[in-house]
Amino acid sequence: DMQNDFIDGSLGTKEAQEIVTPVAEKIRNFEGDIYGTLDTHEEDYLSTQEGKNLPVKHCICGEDGWALDSEIMQAIAETKAEVHNFCRKGTFGSMELAQILKETYEDQEVEIELIGLCTDICVISNAMLIKAALPEVKVSVDSSCCAGVTPESHRNALEAMKMCQIEIV
């Protein structure tokens, strides 16, 4: 979820801003298939379960904060990788993404690497969903291209994923 609200918007952090260029470079230089997610909420966000626990409007569909960061968009335009449609998700993890990856790669020998925001919420949720859908596939997370809500929660999420056989690079 390399979206404006997570980088320099309503939920942005210094750490998130610091990974934009490394993430863009990774996208630009990647060869393979790129899938992505977009945190997507509606105007009623504050009345949802998530909104009650995190009462900060963010990633409202169609607003500037919902859009991908411009440097990330430029990298997507320049990459030679095959970029697939990004999955819109109203929750931390994307069941749709896990299902697409399962249907596409279940009988193939592939590696899946995750990058992005936020390590301790969406990245860990998606990593666990993907690992559950594809238990024999190597799943990894590039920690240099991730940031959490806080540096401590970022580290905790990396440790938790490591315990679930997700490689941290």
Where are these regions (language model features)?
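Active-site acidic carboxylates
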Residues: 2-85, 107-108, 136-140, 149-163, ...
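Short, contiguous clusters of charged residues that form electrostatic/catalytic patches at enzyme active sites
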Residues: 21, 66, 70, 95, ...
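Gly/Ala-rich phosphate-binding loop of Rossmann-like dinucleotide-binding domains
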Residues: 131
